[in-house]
């Protein structure tokens, strides 16, 4: 098998991690009002679900653990066991009958997602050819779009009649049949739609586990490991977190992490809220039914996938600085338009959804995944990503808790929340456009030598 085909095959297998990451977030989002009705949850409860989920703190905890584990024991070690933890978390959500069970399921799933992210982005970059790193990261981001699309379509088909809708989705009868086996009705019956959606993630996680545990170890990690073993024992001894100090004692590392966190953090503050609360916002502030909110969001993900595909074709061939600037500008314009036209306006919702989809297709996350895997040496490449992901998702958890109180029970604070998110989006536009590195066409070893010298 050629190197190009091999890297593409491994990219597709590892990309299932992105599918399950975004899928877990959107599965929670698409059924949020159903769980709220079933368990009698307040906006504060919803804020906690977001805060500890794959969207925020759960992933943050998993990332800092997974990053160091991937550097010490290898990328393959993560793929051998992590999906089993994901399946456990999803299973807990599927059988939840109270808020603590649901919260625990979201937390376990989130931790698993976080553990897998640094290893997956690092593995993809290390197994890509020089001219295909951006393409392969783009393909992995397509999985990040395909997951929500499938989940939202499934959620739409299974949606119960809510809001002004006279009937449920085309497959709501399946939920009624399954719910009937357990003798449930009302809100308890409606939430079976969400349980089935999470079951679909369980199935995909099982497939991912079988594919990923058969992957070969990263050749670059093995080379870095072999080089480290040649060093005196006292230079390499230490715990799993032995490289933690090295990250913060090198000026190049510090400036790189400040740059990457600066561009990714405020973007993620906005996108974490939209990833988890978008259908809920469309229902409460926008006045749509659960079915139509999910359908509009699903249409958005179709545009995201198409835009990401175009991104994957051109990112290795154009100046990445300007491609980045165009993508983030779409997001800034989206918030300007929704503030001007209003969330209650159908035209405002449609324009916002389209522009939001375009920015997500050429997303800050795509560039973050690419640059974060290029700008650090192999020996702590995943650990550096784990630290940054921990910071970003951890602070996103705090913002998610604040957002629900700003937004209000029925969206009365939407204008203020949207104004804040517009301000958040301007920050990565400036930081990323000004500080974009020039790495296109260079090997990872060449980039490392240029930035760190021969000692690394």
Language-model segments: which ranges?
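Helix-to-loop junctions at the C-terminal end of transmembrane segments
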Residues: 63-74, 308-320
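Glycine-rich segments within core transmembrane alpha-helices of 12-TM secondary carriers
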Residues: 134-163, 204, 389-400
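Extracytoplasmic gate region of multi-pass secondary transporters
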Residues: 29, 251-308, 400
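Helix-breaking motifs and short loop linkers at transmembrane-helix boundaries and internal kinks
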Residues: 74, 95-100, 341-344
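Cytoplasmic helix-loop-helix junction between adjacent transmembrane helices
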Residues: 105-142
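Cytosolic juxtamembrane N-terminal segment immediately preceding the first transmembrane helix
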Residues: 1-26, 37
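Extracellular/periplasmic helix-loop-helix junction of adjacent transmembrane segments
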Residues: 29-61
């Amino acid at each position: 098998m050629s190197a190009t085909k091999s890297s593409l095959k491994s990219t597709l297998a590892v990309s299932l991690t992105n599918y399950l990451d975004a899928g877990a977030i959107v599965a929670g989002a698409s059924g949020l009002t159903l769980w709220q009705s079933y368990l009698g949850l307040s906006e504060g409860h919803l804020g906690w679900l977001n805060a500890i989920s794959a969207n925020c703190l759960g992933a943050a905890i998993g990332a800092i653990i997974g990053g160091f584990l991937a550097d010490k024991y290898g990328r393959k070690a993560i793929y051998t066991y992590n999906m089993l933890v994901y399946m456990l978390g999803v299973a807990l959500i599927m059988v939840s009958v109270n808020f603590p069970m649901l919260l625990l399921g979201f937390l376990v799933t989130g931790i698993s997602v976080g553990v897998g992210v640094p290893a997956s982005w690092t593995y993809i970059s290390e197994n890509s050819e020089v001219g295909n790193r951006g393409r392969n990261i783009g393909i992995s981001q397509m999985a990040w779009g395909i997951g929500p699309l499938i989940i939202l379509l499934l959620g739409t088909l299974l949606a119960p009649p809510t809001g002004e809708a006279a009937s449920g989705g085309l497959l709501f009868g399946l939920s009624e049949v399954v719910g009937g086996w357990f003798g449930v009705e009302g809100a308890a019956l409606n939430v079976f739609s969400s349980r089935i959606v999470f079951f679909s993630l369980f199935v995909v996680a099982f497939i991912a586990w079988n594919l990923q545990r058969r992957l070969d170890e990263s050749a670059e990690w093995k080379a870095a490991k072999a080089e480290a073993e040649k060093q005196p024992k006292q230079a390499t001894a230490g715990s799993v977190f032995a490289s933690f100090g090295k990250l913060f004692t090198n000026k190049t590392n510090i400036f790189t992490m400040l740059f990457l966190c600066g561009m990714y953090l405020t973007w993620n503050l906005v996108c974490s809220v939209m990833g988890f609360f978008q259908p809920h916002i469309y229902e409460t502030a926008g006045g749509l039914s659960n079915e139509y909110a999910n359908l509009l969001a699903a249409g958005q993900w179709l545009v995201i996938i198409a835009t990401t595909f175009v991104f994957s074709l051109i990112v290795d061939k154009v100046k990445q600085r300007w491609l980045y600037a165009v993508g983030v500008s779409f997001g800034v314009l989206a918030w300007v338009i929704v503030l001007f036209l209003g969330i209650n306006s159908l035209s405002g919702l449609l324009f916002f959804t389209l522009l939001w989809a375009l920015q997500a297709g050429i997303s800050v996350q795509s560039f973050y995944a690419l640059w974060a895997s290029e700008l650090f040496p192999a020996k702590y490449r995943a650990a550096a990503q784990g630290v940054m992901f921990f910071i970003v998702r951890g602070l996103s958890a705090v913002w998610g808790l604040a957002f629900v109180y700003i937004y209000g029970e029925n969206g009365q604070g939407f204008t203020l929340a949207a104004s804040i998110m517009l301000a958040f989006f301007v920050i990565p536009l400036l930081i990323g456009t000004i500080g974009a590195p020039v790495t296109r066409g260079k090997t990872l070893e060449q980039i490392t030598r240029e930035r760190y010298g021969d000692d690394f």
